[in-house]
Every structure is written in structure tokens, then in C-alpha cells.
Amino acid sequence: MKIALVHDYIKEYGGAERVLEALHELYPQADVYTSLYLPSYLGPHRARFKSWKIKTSFLQYIPGKAKLISPLRLLSPLAFKSFDFSGYDLIISSATGAYFPNSVRKNSAQLICYCHTPPRYLYGYATARQWKHNVLLRIIGETMNHILRIVDLNASKNVDFYIANSLEVKARIKKFYRRDAVVVYPPVELDLQKETKGQERAYFLTGGRLARAKHVDVIVQACSELGVPLKVFGKAFAGYGEELRKMANRKWLMVDGVKKSTIEFLGEVDDKEKLELMRGAKAFLFASEDEDFGITPVEAMGQGTPVIAYRSGGVKETIEEGKSGLFFDQLNKESLIEQLKVFDKKKLKEEECIARAKKFSKERFFKEVASVISKKTA
């Protein structure tokens, strides 16, 4: 069976790209199609895709394309329609909700969509909102979004079967597309896990994609006010990193005789560094709004690190309250501070966190995806 994998674009390495990587591991002979491939923006993750056979669209040849990701979504349906899938038996789209990969001309192939979420910006979910402050941009943006909702709905009809990455996303698919879906949770790397008993856990940790919808500012403000040490890792977008640094406090701690800020920004890190950070953290803090699934909190649990998360979206499915983590109910620093103050008293256990994370292993993902696809292509 000849298989093609289709992904919106490859410019950053997040949860969706981890799923694409796992699909490619499951189907190593599959060709990969994407509208744009920008390896220079992938940082320490660039090598992951180096040996892949990646086919790009005409968008790859547009000057300044890296800074035009948002406006280029208007051309993305044409980009995916431009690919020739004749001769393929199966197309698996990894649809992040950024572009419209389900617009492909599938010919005689079957199209199965692994849906990370319907486009958040089209259906009222948390995303970048700065453009709405400008009246003219808001009028233009809302008009284009109306057109793109029609495009998205038409593309959804092209899909033969949906796989959702969480119950949260399954409900969105039903609500906006009137389609059923089976849930297969994304794969989480657990094989690098090490024994952490006796290791000092001296700080709180947050990180991942530092976008505004992740609300890292709430975490920075809460930890600043309490004066507790916080490490922040990840790539920042659209000037958000500078905003976070400006709001970070000017309180200092003495560490080995050296005066250091309580808030430390580490930038982008590779997987080994990330897991080491997680193993040394008291808890991983997560304030994302309407999160589709949330791989990073599960990775933290896999290192025996509990999670304190905003009660929203997919993390409600992954965190066992009182066992592998805690929730705060209001998206503000005061609500998070309440949980930070009682965290030590809860005495959450490493083994509970690890046991929970194992339910989201890569091996489980391989087995479930292969089973679904086998049944649907039989």
C-alpha cells in the first residue's frame, strides 16, 4: 500500500510535529507532503527531518515566506490541491488547524485525518488576538475568516475518516464538522525516563511553545509575586518572549554565593535537556487555554513530576487531580498562587505521575493508529 503523509507546514517543533514524526516512524516508506519546510527555524530539532523525503508546494518559493505564515493560509488550499496523489492508496493528514491540508485532491486514495484541532482562529478558541485591536484589520480579518470557515468546512467533507487527538478535539469535530471521530492520544516519549528518587527538586518549570494562548505570563506573574524559582524553556513567538522578560520580577536568590533572578529564561532546549529540567522540577506549570491535548505536561509526569494546570481543554483528560497534579480554575495569577501555596502539602507521588504518563506511550500510539487504519482500509 502506497502511503502519503500530509502536514500543514514544518517550521517549528511542537506536539503536532511529534505526531508527524511518529507517523513517519510507523510508515517509514511514506512520502511527506507539506506546504512549507523551513529547517533553519527548527533549532535543535532540525536533524529530525534531515533524512526525510519531503515534498513542498509553490509556497516554498515565495520570498519572505517565514514571516508570511499567517497570510499564506489564504493560499494554502491551492498549495495542497497542487500536489499529485495519483498512485497513492492512502493519504494520512496531520492537520494542526493552521492551514488546510484536507483540501488535497485525493483521486482514488482514501483520506484519513489525524486532527489536532479544527482551526482555533476560525472557531473562537484562544489564539493570537493582537490584530483585533486595529479596527481596519479586524474588519478584514473577520471577513477573511468567514471565507476560510467555508473553505475549512468543504475540506472536512473530503475526509473519509477522522482520528481526534483527544476527547476535547473529538467534540470540536462533531460540533463544527458534524463528523464522528475515534480518539487516539498523541505519543509521548517515555524511554528516556530515569530514576529520580532522592534527586533534589528545587524549582518550578514551564515551557514549550511560548505563544500568547499558552498564558505563560500568568505563570511568570504568580511565581514573581511569591518569589519562588521558575525556569522557562522554549521558543517565543511574536515578541512574547520580551514581554515575559519585562514582567519577570527583580527579586534575587543567592545560589552558591551568586545572586540570581528567581525567573530564568533558558531559550530552546533539546529533548535531553528538557527531560533533565523536568526531573529537577518540583512541578510543571501549565496555563494554556483550550489546549487541544498538551504533550508537555504528560512528558513531565513521565519524569515523575506533577503538573499544576489551568482546568481547560485536553489536560482534563491527562492529569488525575490529586494524584498526578492539581488544577487552578481561574486564568489569573491569584488562582495559580492558591495552588502553589498548597502544593507541598499535597505530597503528590512520583510513581503516580509515571503510571499516568505510561498510558500515553508511543508504543500505545503505534498500536492504536495501526489498528484504526487497518480496519478502515480493509
Label the model's feature ranges.
Residues Q29-F100:
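Active-site donor-binding segments of glycosyltransferases and PAPS-dependent sulfotransferases
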Residues R73, L78, K345-K375:
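A charged, aromatic-enriched C-terminal amphipathic alpha-helix characteristic of glycosyltransferases
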Residues W131-Y162, K170-A171:
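Membrane-proximal helix-turn-helix segments that form the acceptor-binding/catalytic region
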Residues V188, T196-K214, V220-K231:
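Conserved donor-binding/catalytic core segment of Leloir-type glycosyltransferases
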Residues G234, E242-L275:
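Nucleotide-activated donor-binding/catalytic signature segment of Leloir-type glycosyltransferases, i.e.
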Residues E289:
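Aromatic "clamp/platform" in nucleotide-sugar-dependent glycosyltransferases that forms part
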Residues P306-A309:
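Short hydrophobic beta-strand element within catalytic cores of glycosyltransferases
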Residues E321-G322, L326-N332, L340-K347:
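Conserved acidic donor-binding segment of nucleotide-sugar-dependent glycosyltransferases
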